[in-house]
Regions:
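Acidic/histidine-rich helix-loop elements
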Residues: 152-185, 242-248, 270-277, 312-314, ...
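Extracellular ectodomain segments of secreted/surface proteins
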Residues: 83-85, 89-114
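N-terminal active-site segment of His-dependent metallophosphoesterases
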Residues: 118, 123-213, 291
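Extended active-site neighborhood of metal-dependent phosphoesterases/phosphodiesterases
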Residues: 136-140, 214-287, 324-325, 350-358, ...
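Active-site environment of divalent metal-dependent phosphoester hydrolases
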Residues: 157-160, 210-215, 239-245, 270-273, ...
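Residue-level detector of structural "landmarks"
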Residues: 24-33, 43-58, 64-67, 73
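His/acidic metal-ligating clusters that form di-metal
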Residues: 190-201, 272-355, 405-424
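A short C-terminal boundary segment appended to hydrolase-like catalytic domains
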Residues: 376-424
Length: 424
């Protein structure tokens, strides 16, 4: 897989090495976990994706919110700036986990011993270490034009998480009796954090509900619509149309922002898990790409399909729709990337030069949303985990779904979560 962080300047080296043994084991890197465990004070094995080395400090007590430069003995080291780190309450479920969640031109996000830490105020293209995790910030992309955000797979109305079938034997997860349903907990946390970044637009890319019930769609609108009003764009997913329901079924939507145009497509088809695109949708997108005077980001619920080892065991966008979508986007260079949901994971592919990204879900682990910073020389995707303590607790419970395999599947690699989209 191409290293997406090198798209703008053709440079490698923006994918740091995460040297925590726990992270290594969770990601399925058995060799890394074994090597790291043998050298606990200076882990040096290679994380998938490569990058700079650095010692893995033992767990530290990270305060809930702290300006590092104000502490006489800060619990981490930095180089090139005095960051602002903002964290949420600790989670009791995975107290030993330390992960680099994402990087940005001015900072990074980490998950450290049950807290989400956001570090800001750093210089672009610079090396740092926070809580024993080394990373390099994204390159300087020029002046910021605007910010937009996306979420997907919020599943209002869902009551059981992790169920496959009665014979699977997998542990399932539910909200405690009398507690706020977990889809609402996760969405409210995401909405509050998205609102704080002042987005020009917010896009929810399908699976608004679990089973297409009108009352659940109303609940979605109450949480997301009341927060963002006219800034909100949303479209249905397969869970919203299993029984032929017709809400949020707009074939195509467009929103022009400062520095970028958003094109949202309805890929869902009634009574089907998989998705498709009509001739009319593709003709419209082709014409939009031909006449656009600024970069266009294309969005939909279903990701492109590929018959390879990364393909999930359920339908995605149809093969025909995938081929035709990629053909249009490869021909029209203003169409910069395709962003989807549906798979509940972070994954980036490049097909015929077209960047196609999947973003993990809001409703369970990792409990995430994506921020897109539109700069003069590229668009940075920065994946975020929700910070609210009750949301972190639920996300960490569901990390272990499907026999413990879900965590690594859903998180993906760093370059699946943080990358730069070249404005071609």
């Amino acid at each position: 897989m191409a290293r997406q962080l090198a798209l703008v300047h053709g440079r490698a080296g923006h994918v740091p090495r995460v040297t925590c043994v726990t992270c290594a084991a969770m990601r399925g890197d058995a060799a890394l976990a074994t090597t790291a465990a043998a050298t606990p004070d200076a882990h040096s094995a290679q994380d998938r994706g490569g990058g700079a080395t650095g010692p893995c400090a033992r767990a530290t007590s990270v305060p809930r919110a702290v300006i590092a430069s104000s502490l006489p003995r800060p619990p981490w080291r930095t180089a090139g700036g005095s960051p602002l780190a903002v964290g949420a309450g600790a989670c009791p479920y995975t107290p030993a986990v330390r992960e680099l969640v994402s990087i940005a031109p001015d900072g990074a996000e980490l998950f450290v011993d049950g807290r989400v830490l956001r570090v800001r105020g750093l210089a672009p293209d610079s090396d740092h270490e926070v809580a024993g995790i080394a990373f390099r910030t994204m390159p300087d992309l020029g002046a910021l034009r605007c910010v937009f955000a996306t979420g997907n797979d919020v599943h209002f109305g869902e009551t059981v998480c992790g169920h496959v079938d009665d014979a699977s034997g997998h542990e399932v997860f539910t909200s405690e009796p009398g507690a706020t349903p977990y889809p609402e907990v996760m969405s409210r946390a995401a909405v509050a954090e998205i609102a704080s970044c002042g987005p020009a637009a917010v896009v929810v890319k399908g699976d608004l509900t679990n089973d297409g019930e009108d009352e659940d769609y109303d609940a979605f609108l109450q949480v997301w619509g009341e927060a963002f009003g006219e800034r909100l764009l949303h479209v249905r997913g397969n869970h919203d149309s299993y029984r032929g329901q017709g809400f949020a079924a707009w074939d195509r939507q467009v929103r022009v922002l400062d520095g970028v145009t958003l094109a949202l497509l309805d890929t869902a088809r009634p009574f089907e898990v998989g998705g498709s695109l009509s001739d009319e949708q593709l003709t419209w997108l082709d014409e939009l790409g031909r006449t656009a005077h600024q970069p266009v980001v294309v969005l939909g619920h279903h990701p492109v399909s590929r018959d390879d080892e990364l393909a999930p065991p359920f339908p995605l966008l149809s093969d025909d729709a995938t081929v035709r979508l990629v053909e249009v986007m490869a021909r029209r260079t203003s169409l910069t990337c395709y962003l989807a949901g549906h798979t509940h994971r972070n994954l980036v592919r490049r097909i015929e030069g077209v960047l196609c990204a999947e973003v993990a879900c809001v409703k369970d682990f990792p409990g995430g949303w994506a921020e897109y910073r539109v700069h003069e020389r590229g668009i940075a995707q920065v994946f975020h985990r929700v910070q609210a303590p009750e949301a972190v607790a639920w996300a960490e419970r569901t990390r272990r779904m499907f026999g413990g395999l879900y965590g690594a599947y859903a998180m993906g690699r760093l370059e699946d979560r943080s990358f730069v989209v070249a404005t071609r």
